[in-house]
């Protein structure tokens, strides 16, 4: 939005030309989202406390979690507002990639909001019925997938980028729609499963978003794209602004979500952030890179799948509790230790993922 205003004002003062620089807008997008989150945080926490919108804690969970009962939840609204406002201020609004991410972010946020509302306000422990949750997630993901396929059909935008192989980029055709669906829905639910400890989900989200900001910058630059042997996508550059907004909003939220948390993001935050990361990965043609950089989310999800599968097939559990972060809690690890170690692993995976762009 401000880019267009600056382009009009530059004829009166050349200083406004700075708004055309992607790096400048990326930095101020991060700072804007961070400032909004820090300013709105105390006000939103007070508002949620006034409405008595507190976290529901399972009775069969770790005993250390019982003290979390009543902590304000649905704080993901703070993240979504910060990201959306900052993005709309600093991005070029005629970019279709940006709107794809925002549609998924807001749409999945609404699904998560309804789920949280039913759990916390209406005291329905099941929340939004699972089949309806997956139905609306699927509708949104497929809608965006069809739109993206129509826009980039038979171009580099629908190729599959395989790590370590610079010349292996098969054209997916209609399979692109199916892959997009699974990546968006899968990542959304993976982040949701990871969001079980104070700050556990938000920091890996920040790391992955920061990694994708670098990838988006390279993908939108023809020289760097050719150098790294990745598809050049002219619309990808503006995703840098979205990614840095996620980083800023995430850090701002972490200010209040760090152990011991003053607020939880709830499904409104985790489903939306996961969906946004999945959409960004698909738009950049880096689905495999998401698996590497988002390895913490992948392991958390696999731990649940293995736990459920093992119990149904053998009547035995593999872990003391799933997702796997609860397993380590029940082994006696203090919550902050689990959180920080998962953060360290997440940072390492993001760096490894970025390194694969060059190792081809």
UniProtKB/Swiss-Prot annotation:
One of its GO terms (molecular function) is UDP-N-acetylmuramoyl-L-alanyl-D-glutamyl-meso-2,6-diaminopimelyl-D-alanyl-D-alanine:undecaprenyl-phosphate transferase activity. The chain crosses the membrane at residues 27-47, 71-91, 94-114, 132-152, 168-188, 199-219, 236-256, 263-283, 288-308, 338-358. Its cofactor is Mg(2+). PROSITE patterns: MRAY_1, MRAY_2. It is an enzyme of class 2 (transferase). Keywords: Cell cycle, Cell division, Cell inner membrane, Cell membrane, Cell shape, Cell wall biogenesis/degradation, Magnesium, Membrane, Metal-binding, Peptidoglycan synthesis, Transferase, Transmembrane, Transmembrane helix. GO terms for cellular component: plasma membrane. Its EC number is 2.7.8.13. Pathway: Cell wall biogenesis; peptidoglycan biosynthesis. GO terms for biological process: cell division; cell wall organization; peptidoglycan biosynthetic process; regulation of cell shape. It comes from the Bacteria. It catalyses: UDP-N-acetyl-alpha-D-muramoyl-L-alanyl-gamma-D-glutamyl-meso-2,6-diaminopimeloyl-D-alanyl-D-alanine + di-trans,octa-cis-undecaprenyl phosphate = di-trans,octa-cis-undecaprenyl diphospho-N-acetyl-alpha-D-muramoyl-L-alanyl-D-glutamyl-meso-2,6-diaminopimeloyl-D-alanyl-D-alanine + UMP. Pfam families: Glycos_transf_4, MraY_sig1. It is found in: Cell inner membrane. It is a multi-pass membrane protein. Coiled coil: none annotated. InterPro entries: Glycosyl_transferase_4, PNAcMuramoyl-5peptid_Trfase, PNAcMuramoyl-5peptid_Trfase_CS. HAMAP family: MraY. Catalyzes the initial step of the lipid cycle reactions in the biosynthesis of the cell wall peptidoglycan: transfers peptidoglycan precursor phospho-MurNAc-pentapeptide from UDP-MurNAc-pentapeptide onto the lipid carrier undecaprenyl phosphate, yielding undecaprenyl-pyrophosphoryl-MurNAc-pentapeptide, known as lipid I. PANTHER family: PHOSPHO-N-ACETYLMURAMOYL-PENTAPEPTIDE-TRANSFERASE, PHOSPHO-N-ACETYLMURAMOYL-PENTAPEPTIDE-TRANSFERASE HOMOLOG. Belongs to the glycosyltransferase 4 family. MraY subfamily. This is Phospho-N-acetylmuramoyl-pentapeptide-transferase.
């Amino acid at each position: 939005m401000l880019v267009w205003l600056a382009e009009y004002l530059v004829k009166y003062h050349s200083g406004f030309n700075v708004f055309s620089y992607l790096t400048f807008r990326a930095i101020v997008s991060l700072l804007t989202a961070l400032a909004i989150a820090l300013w709105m945080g105390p006000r939103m926490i007070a508002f949620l406390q006034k409405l008595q919108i507190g976290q529901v804690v399972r009775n069969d969970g770790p005993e250390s979690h019982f003290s979390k009962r009543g902590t304000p939840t649905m704080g993901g609204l703070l993240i979504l507002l910060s990201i959306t406002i900052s993005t709309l201020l600093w991005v070029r609004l005629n970019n279709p990639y940006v709107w794809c991410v925002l549609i998924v972010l807001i749409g999945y946020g609404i699904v998560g909001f309804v789920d949280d509302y039913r759990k916390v306000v209406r005291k329905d422990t099941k929340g939004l019925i699972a089949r309806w949750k997956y139905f609306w997630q699927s509708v949104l993901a497929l809608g965006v997938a069809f739109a993206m396929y129509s826009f980039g059909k038979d171009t580099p935008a629908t190729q599959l980028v395989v790590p370590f192989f610079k010349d292996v980029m098969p054209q997916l055709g209609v399979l692109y729609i199916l892959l997009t669906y699974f990546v968006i829905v899968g990542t959304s639910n993976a982040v949701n499963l990871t969001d079980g400890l104070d700050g556990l989900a938000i920091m890996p989200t920040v790391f992955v978003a920061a990694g994708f900001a670098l990838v988006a910058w390279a993908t939108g630059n023809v020289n760097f794209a050719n150098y790294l042997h990745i598809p050049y996508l002219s619309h990808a550059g503006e995703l840098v602004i979205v990614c840095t907004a996620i980083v800023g909003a995430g850090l701002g939220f972490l200010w209040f979500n760090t152990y011991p948390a003053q607020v939880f993001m709830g499904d409104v935050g985790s489903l939306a952030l996961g969906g946004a990361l999945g959409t960004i990965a698909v738009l950049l043609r880096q689905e495999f890179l998401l698996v590497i950089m988002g390895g913490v989310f992948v392991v958390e999800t696999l731990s649940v799948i293995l736990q459920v599968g093992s119990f149904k097939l053998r009547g035995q559990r593999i872990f003391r509790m799933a997702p796997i972060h609860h397993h380590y809690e029940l082994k006696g690890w203090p919550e902050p230790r689990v959180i920080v170690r998962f953060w360290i692993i997440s940072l390492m995976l993001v760096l490894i993922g970025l390194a694969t762009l060059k190792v081809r």
